[in-house]
């Protein structure tokens, strides 16, 4: 009987893992901006669970957090954290207008379907993450990016549920790559893409994070 119970629990856990929502970070670009700094762009494959779809359709606000870090490796001490920044989006549904609303900062966009809202959320574009005076041409840094559902912004009852329910665990792994500052001036190479400045860690120089 104990063996049967364990099998049932294992199958239930396996099913939960198979259907858990997730985010995958793809096509990262860290490129020079017109003002001499650097902007980050990436695509996110966001897999919503039915529980999250139901929650937002019933009026619960969901907050998504993109986090970016840039570190300078130091062989003699801990790595120096050069940049640690984030960007937040708020996803809501308004029953009166039957529209989904996606907000970040002062920007607000409305959509007729959840899929449309998620498509926009999945496209991270031209995020200013690094000033030109923080780095020197030819320097290399460890870069990392992830996106996740910020469960700390949920109402307390949902925060408690999120602790034990995988339906609320919506997050990517940290996507890490090696970023090398172009030797040419950022202003002269504003059209350059990440393929010239970003390399996945453990990949040959000049590659791109996928």
Language-model segments: which ranges?
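Beta-strand-rich interaction surfaces with strong enrichment in secreted/lumenal proteins
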Residues: 27-30, 78, 130-133
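Structured domain cores in non-transmembrane regions
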Residues: 55-124
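Cleaved targeting-peptide boundary
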Residues: 18-28
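A short, structured loop/turn motif at beta-sheet edges
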Residues: 33-38, 93-98, 133-142
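Bacterial N-terminal signal peptides
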Residues: 3-16
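Glycine-rich, aromatic-bearing surface loops/beta-hairpins
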Residues: 137-210
